[in-house]
């Protein structure tokens, strides 16, 4: 089937935000009038961008206290690596790579966590104590799943702290 997901890409950035289930995902099976369904789906996805911008603006206006930033980062690490061993710390994935991500707001924390999780390259330790670098995510499926999960985590944090 053909699938369209709304997303938000920062300028000069390769970590595209795939919004969670709450913001219009469109699937078109390969049967019937596929072309018409794809066109309708494209209009539906385009209509979602105003809601995405509203969420982004709300996240930018919410200053996150350090414990909330740590909780968001810990949830992301647990989602990605599980409970057993996490090769990096919350401080590692909360360290911004870009000047514009040094803010104290939810959006900056979300963008920083997302970029660090997707790009990898963060120094850490294996379960046996050996020095390692986290791996970048290259799989489309893993990328989409992680992006969705991070969006839902950020959205949940936004709703609970408003």
PLM features: what roles do these ranges have?
Residues 2-162:
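Intrinsically disordered, low-complexity regions enriched in serine/threonine
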């Amino acid at each position: 089937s053909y699938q369209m997901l709304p997303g938000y890409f920062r300028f000069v950035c390769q970590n595209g935000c795939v919004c969670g289930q709450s913001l219009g995902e469109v699937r078109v099976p390969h049967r019937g009038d596929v072309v018409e369904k794809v066109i309708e789906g494209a209009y539906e996805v385009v209509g979602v961008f105003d809601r995405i911008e509203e969420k982004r603006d709300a996240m930018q206006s919410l200053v996150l206290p350090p414990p909330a930033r740590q909780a968001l980062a810990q949830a992301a690490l647990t989602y990605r690596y599980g409970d057993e061993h996490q090769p990096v710390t919350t401080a590692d994935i909360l360290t911004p790579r870009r000047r514009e991500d040094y803010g104290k707001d939810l959006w900056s924390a979300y963008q920083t966590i997302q970029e660090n999780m997707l790009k990898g390259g963060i120094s850490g330790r294996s379960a046996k104590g050996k020095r390692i670098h986290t791996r970048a995510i290259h799989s489309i499926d893993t990328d989409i799943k992680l992006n969705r999960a991070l969006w839902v985590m950020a959205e949940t944090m936004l709703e609970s702290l408003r």
